[in-house]
Amino acid sequence: FENLSGPKVASPKWAAPVKLKADDKIFRVMAGVNGSIQGPAEAKWGYTTLSISDWDGDGLPDIIYNSILGKVEWLKNIGTRTSPRLTKSQPIEVDWQGPALKPAWNWWNPTEKQLVTQWRTTPVVFDMNQDGMPDLCMLDTEGYFVFFERSIKDGKRILLPPVRVFCDPAGKPLRFNDRIAGASGRRKITLCDWNGDGETDLLLNSSNADLYLGLGKKEGKWLFEKKGTLAKQNIEGHDVSPTTVDFDGDGVADFLGGAEDGRFYWMKNPRSK
């Protein structure tokens, strides 16, 4: 959906949707007959959830996504910022120090460096340690919110194995889903500075989105305190997918959520003037 209004317009006008293509073919994830943990009735479903970031450091925004399959992959942009062209999907690779991890209920095994985790949960691409390289933050195979750090090895960017360094104020690792199989995953997440204090906060799907205020880093762990939902209105069907935008250009992150009814919901940040 192209924004036709330009910057600093609180209620933009949008162009008609255009289907994304990867390797010149319409991009669509489908489970196929055995790709969904909930069975073949979902053969044509995709459950895609994504982040936009310059994953490879070439100055162009790429797409990093998860889906019904639990395979975290990316679409490299080989076009321009105004006319993107996407390559075919390729796996996000982890420099595992042993066998690649997978959910216990998966009937198939990942390849040597492949990143496989719980389905239907956002791969949040964010430079958490502020070293200039985007990291990956998302649920691991057991539902904990974990940190995949980017690093350099032999002159190339790599992704290190996950560590559970996102915790509550008591230092207990954040676990956003302890259920298994079809009930696993299903958590939509974004990271931002919601209250403007310079610390990274977290928004997690709920009736709209739950706010976890960042308390900073202590003894190697990032601490977050749950503060409740952003608003009273319930827009949830299954999951609300939260992100932040600044349509009006005031420098303050506002809430944008995609809901199961197919609509986008926008809410102005309370600290915005």
Put a short name on every predicted segment.
Residues 57-67, 130-139, 196-205, 249-258:
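Acidic/hydrophobic-patterned starts of short beta strands in beta-sheet-rich repeat architectures
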Residues 238-273:
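Blade-level signature of beta-propeller repeat domains, shared across WD40, Kelch, NHL, RCC1
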Residues 70-71, 143-144, 208-211, 262-263:
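Loop/turn residues immediately N-terminal
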Residues 50, 63, 74-77, 123, ...:
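Hydrophobic strand positions within the blades of repeat-based beta-sheet folds
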Residues 48-55, 120-128, 177-178, 186-194, ...:
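Beta-propeller blade termini
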Residues 67, 76, 138-140, 149, ...:
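Active-site proximal loops enriched in glycine and acidic residues that flank catalytic Cys/His/Asp
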